[in-house]
A protein has these predicted regions:
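Post-DEXD/H (motif II) to motif III coupling segment of the RecA-like Helicase ATP-binding lobe
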Residues: 1-31
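Conserved nucleotide-binding/hydrolysis micro-motifs of P-loop NTPases
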Residues: 2-4, 26-29, 83-87, 139, ...
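Conserved C-terminal RecA-like helicase domain
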Residues: 22-25, 58-157, 181-190
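Glycine-rich phosphate-binding "P-loop"
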Residues: 32-60, 127-134
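A conserved mid-domain beta-alpha-beta active-site/ligand-binding segment of alpha/beta enzyme cores
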Residues: 48-71, 238-257
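Conserved segment of the helicase C-terminal RecA-like domain
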Residues: 170, 174, 180-230
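C-terminal helicase module of SF1/SF2 nucleic-acid helicases/translocases
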Residues: 206-302
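C-terminal accessory/interaction regions of large nucleic acid-associated machines
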Residues: 254-292, 310-567
Length: 567
């Protein structure tokens, strides 16, 4: 409601002169309901009077699957869950009451999932019953076919976290929200409005239903009501948020003591708040060192006396500040020392680019120490193992190694499951939730939790966290050795999921990893790739190759790079 607040971040802008237009008009209707399964009550929410009206009782034995089936058996449904574990559990529970559909497209899609992901993957079983779930990385071809099947009405119901709901425009008639939490924190009004905006899309329908469902006693009724009734509040820039401001004095204390790890702040703040406060601290130290007047420095000004400012400036001169707010000076110094000592990425050997697994684990453990993952990444790559310190890093190394070698998803999952078989005491985890102390290789549910976790690791750890740290290592390596480019750059390998130059070229041209692997298969390579004057060209027949993902991507790439295609 107040976008002008962000102009305060820009110097010499007169905010009083800003003009804005706000509208509450919407071309579609949304009907919102609150279903309290714990109390057995159903309510309709009136958006105009901002009130709840009781519309009936809910049978005590009713579960989420009963509600979804009763309301949306002939409609398109999206069920939002706040964790990957719940996505899988709720989807399986719901689909268990549905018959298998005799539909060729669903049967074909289910078979491809078994081949490309895993034979025991719940997703394949669910697809045949008109249900799907989304918990992380999926091959492009499968993801697009799931979305198309939903648009076509063959798939009726998708269970997912906020990632898919917010990122895809799907024609849902009903949205079921099973929690007011997004991960480990409560949803705010903006997140809620963005979530409910997924139903009632003018392209597909003129109205949609939103069902907020309270399924656990620990979830507070008032929090659901607040989301329904509260307007989006005026926004503050993050440094001025109450949750952040109350810790600013601790930031000053830590910095005055020369503590860039912000020990006091870390002990007092939540992980999410600490991440933001750490970035503020890095900007603040640079502002003081360079004597810059910025909104960040002004936010600290009332908490800063001459003595504190002097100590901070003394502890953090310009050369001890960082231009990258994701990495502090101490991390950068540690990294430079590591690279100058001769550290390189693990070597690739032989025709198949073999990597010594223990060498890779050792390299990752060195990065863990350099970048202080145990402090800054303690929920993922910095987490200590339950039976040995490096067991979590070893688990990620298994997936990382298969990823950069260009293995398909089924191979990556196969090796992830094999690792768990050999190390059952590493337990069964989905995100930060421990599902079992010991992995049981004969348990289909354990296998599917590992599959879900592996998909999440690829999307959130490999392609985000590890990729980012490898990027910094590669930049530092180039700087120390005065290189523009070097062989064996694992940052590239992670980004493209391969060490194969052809696959990297195709991805640089715009194809996804899976489509690139499809194109480079010997039979397809002969059909679709042609070398002209030393340059690789793509035959236009690829536009009708029969692979939905490849066809979709090829049309987009041809539009942007027509010179890449020939008849």
């Amino acid at each position: 409601p107040n976008p002008e607040v962000y102009l305060s971040l820009i110097p010499k802008i007169n905010i009083d002169e800003v003009k804005k237009l706000a509208s509450k008009y919407t071309p579609v209707c949304q009907f919102k309901y609150f279903l309290d399964l714990c109390e057995g009550q159903a309510y309709f929410h009136n958006d105009y009077s901002k009130s709840l009206s009781s519309i009936g009782n809910i049978p005590q034995e009713d579960e989420l699957s009963d509600i979804v089936n009763r309301v949306g058996s002939t409609q398109q449904n999206i069920i939002y869950c706040n964790s990957r574990q719940k996505v899988v559990d709720y989807a399986v529970q719901y689909a268990s009451k549905l018959p298998i559909k005799d539909d060729e497209k669903l049967i074909s899609l289910a078979n491809d999932i078994r081949n490309e992901v895993h034979n025991d993957c719940y997703l394949a079983d669910l697809i045949q019953r008109g249900v799907a779930y989304h918990v992380g990385y999926l091959p492009t071809n499968i993801r697009l076919r799931i979305e198309k099947s939903f648009v076509d009405g063959i798939l009726r119901t998708i269970f997912c976290t906020s990632t898919l709901v917010e990122g895809v425009n799907l024609p849902a008639d009903n949205l079921f929200i099973t929690s007011y939490r997004n991960g480990n924190s409560n949803m705010d009004e903006v997140e809620f409005r963005n979530l409910v905006g997924r139903v009632g899309r003018i392209k597909y329908n003129l109205y949609g239903n939103v069902f907020l469902i309270r399924m656990e006693d620990r979830l507070k009724t008032q929090n659901y009501i607040d989301l329904l009734q509260n307007d989006v509040p005026k926004h503050e820039i993050s440094i001025n948020l109450i949750d952040n401001k109350k810790y600013l004095s601790l930031v000053v204390d830590d910095l005055a003591r020369g503590d860039m790890e912000l020990t006091k702040v870390r002990e007092a703040a939540t992980e999410k708040d600490f991440d933001a406060l750490r970035k503020f601290a890095m900007i603040f130290t640079k502002d003081i060192a360079e004597d810059n007047i910025t909104p960040i420095r002004e936010a600290f000004s009332s908490l800063l006396d001459e003595e504190s400012e002097y100590k901070i400036k003394e502890n953090f001169p310009v050369e001890k500040t960082s231009d990258d707010i994701n990495f502090s000076y101490d991390q950068i110094i540690n990294l430079r020392e590591l690279v100058e000592s001769g550290q390189e990425y693990p070597k690739l050997t032989g025709e198949n680019d073999e990597v010594d697994f223990e060498e890779l684990v050792d390299f990752l453990m060195k990065l863990r120490k350099v970048f202080k993952w145990d402090i800054y990444e303690k929920r993922t790559i910095g987490k200590s193992g339950t039976y040995r310190e490096d067991s979590v890093v070893r688990w990620y190394a298994v997936i990382l190694l298969r990823w950069i070698r260009g293995n398909g998803l089924s191979q990556i999952i196969y090796h992830a499951l094999k690792y768990k078989e050999k190390n059952p005491n590493s337990g069964v985890w989905v995100g930060n939730m421990k599902m079992a102390d010991v992995y049981n290789k004969n348990s289909k549910s354990h296998k599917n939790y590992i599959i879900a976790e592996t998909l999440g690791v690829i999307e959130n750890v490999l392609l985000f966290s590890i990729s980012n740290y490898f990027r910094i290592f590669s930049l530092e390596y180039k700087d120390v050795h005065q290189l523009d480019h070097f062989q064996n750059d694992w940052y590239e390998y992670v980004e493209y999921g391969t060490t194969n130059p052809l696959t990297i070229f195709l991805q640089q041209s715009g194809f996804s990893r899976e489509s690139s692997k499809y194109i480079e298969e010997p039979s397809n390579q002969n059909k679709y790739l042609i070398e002209v004057d030393g340059e690789i060209k793509i035959h236009r027949s690829i536009l009708t190759c029969g692979n939905v993902g490849v066809e979709t991507e090829s049309h987009d790439i041809q539009f942007n790079m027509p010179e890449l295609f020939i008849d």
